[in-house]
Curated annotation (Swiss-Prot):
SUPFAM superfamilies the record matches: Thioesterase/thiol ester dehydrase-isomerase
GO cellular component: fatty acid synthase complex; plasma membrane
Pfam families: MaoC_dehydratas
Keywords, comma-separated and alphabetical: Fatty acid metabolism, Lipid metabolism, Lyase
Native organism: Mycobacterium tuberculosis (strain ATCC 25618 / H37Rv)
Gene name of this polypeptide: htdX
Protein name (Swiss-Prot/TrEMBL): 3-hydroxyacyl-thioester dehydratase X
Keyword Lyase: yes
Region described as Disordered: spans on this chain: 149-170
All residue ranges annotated as the MaoC-like domain in the record: 162-256
Family: Belongs to the enoyl-CoA hydratase/isomerase family.
tRNA processing keyword on record: no
Reaction catalyzed: a (3R)-3-hydroxyacyl-CoA = a (2E)-enoyl-CoA + H2O; (2E)-octenoyl-CoA + H2O = (3R)-hydroxyoctanoyl-CoA; (3R)-3-hydroxydodecanoyl-CoA = (2E)-dodecenoyl-CoA + H2O; (3R)-hydroxyhexadecanoyl-CoA = (2E)-hexadecenoyl-CoA + H2O
């Protein structure tokens, strides 16, 4: 099969948000499969330009997330999924690159859902994506989404609020504008209106539009990606959303065979994401 269009996924997500759509409490027992998916070098170049990553013979570490996003969303927007895609929150993302993927490669894609579980704030599910070149898996990803609802764990106490840390000057400052996020949405194929439409963002509880989590996950790598080994693991945990426009400070600590990254609100010090990069 070929990947569905972003518009088709968006329409299915909107239809799936209607309360008349029945939902099961089980994950779909199917795998979305795409054979011989070509990579568009022009799209890779546009992705690199908007995120600040390098454009060369190999795709950036996070690019396959954008490449395979239509396949992931075709699974999540199915009416056999246990909850609606609209309003789901991206909480974590774990990428393992076993070997670089060339911009000239055609790849195979496999996406499945697993590990549906309860959380204090709702239901968590993992979307597992494998990207293959030939017969070998080159890139593996586990994307975790949260659907907010009451569960048996809803009465658990919230973690105590963290005190504002005393921070040194950041290693870099990211200035993120609504225009940049609209460009990322066009390039990355994630047209969720909470990122591009202030009215839609308010309907989902945000005071204004927010940056895509995977935009920030890509942008924080710009200063260190030239030093990555070919085989690498990148784990990201998302915290408070980036309200646009935003100025965020990037803090980088090197050691233990890799890097620890934190993107923080410059005024209040709270984290937008924490991440680790480690060689395999």
């Amino acid at each position: 099969m070929t990947q569905p269009s972003g518009l088709k996924n968006l329409l299915r997500a909107a239809a799936g948000a209607l309360p008349v759509v029945p939902r099961t409490d089980q994950l779909p027992n199917r795998t979305v499969t795409v054979e011989e998916l070509p990579i568009d070098p022009a799209n890779v170049a546009a992705y690199a330009a908007v995120t600040g990553l390098r454009y060369g013979n190999q795709v950036p570490l996070t690019y396959p997330f954008a490449l395979t996003f239509p396949s992931v969303m075709s699974l999540v927007t199915g009416f056999d999924f246990p909850f609606a895609a609209m309003g789901a929150i991206h909480t974590e993302n774990h990428i393992t690159q076993y070997r670089p993927i060339a911009v000239t490669d055609a790849v195979g894609v496999r996406v499945r859902a697993e590990n549906l579980r309860e959380h204090r704030r709702g239901l968590l599910v993992d979307l597992v994506t494998n990207v293959s070149v030939g017969n070998d898996v080159a890139w593996h990803q586990v994307t975790t989404f949260l659907h907010q609802q009451r569960t048996s764990l809803s009465g658990e106490p919230k973690p105590p609020p963290q005190k504002k840390p005393k921070l040194p000057p950041p290693a870099a400052v990211l200035r993120i504008t609504p225009a940049k996020i609209r460009r990322y949405a066009a390039v990355g194929g994630d047209h969720n209106p909470i990122h591009t439409n202030p009215i839609a963002a308010k309907l989902f509880g945000f005071p204004t539009v927010i940056a895509h989590g995977m935009f920030t996950a890509a942008a924080v790598l710009a200063n260190i990606e030239a030093r990555f080994p070919d085989a690498v693991r990148y784990s990201v945990r998302f915290a408070k959303p980036v309200l646009l426009p935003a100025t965020a400070g990037l803090y980088v600590a090197e050691g233990d065979g890799g890097w620890d990254l934190t993107l923080r609100n410059m005024a209040k010090g709270y984290p937008h994401l924490t991440a680790t990069v480690r060689g395999l």
